[in-house]
Amino acid sequence: MEALVYTFLLVSTLGIIFFAIFFREPPKVPDKGSK
């Protein structure tokens, strides 16, 4: 049971970080290219 909880937390944290970086990068590219 504990192993599943730890794995779920690890995957959730990695997913949040991955999405944060993925969503933060796109807006920066067009902004720089527009200028």
UniProtKB/Swiss-Prot annotation:
GO terms for cellular component: chloroplast thylakoid membrane; photosystem II reaction center. The chain crosses the membrane at residues 3-23. It is a single-pass membrane protein. Keywords: Chloroplast, Membrane, Photosynthesis, Photosystem II, Plastid, Thylakoid, Transmembrane, Transmembrane helix. One of its GO terms (biological process) is photosynthesis. InterPro entries: PSII_PsbT, PSII_PsbT_sf. The keyword Metal-binding does not apply. It is found in: Plastid, Chloroplast thylakoid membrane. Belongs to the PsbT family. PSII is composed of 1 copy each of membrane proteins PsbA, PsbB, PsbC, PsbD, PsbE, PsbF, PsbH, PsbI, PsbJ, PsbK, PsbL, PsbM, PsbT, PsbY, PsbZ, Psb30/Ycf12, at least 3 peripheral proteins of the oxygen-evolving complex and a large number of cofactors. It forms dimeric complexes. Found at the monomer-monomer interface of the photosystem II (PS II) dimer, plays a role in assembly and dimerization of PSII. PSII is a light-driven water plastoquinone oxidoreductase, using light energy to abstract electrons from H(2)O, generating a proton gradient subsequently used for ATP formation. This is Photosystem II reaction center protein T.
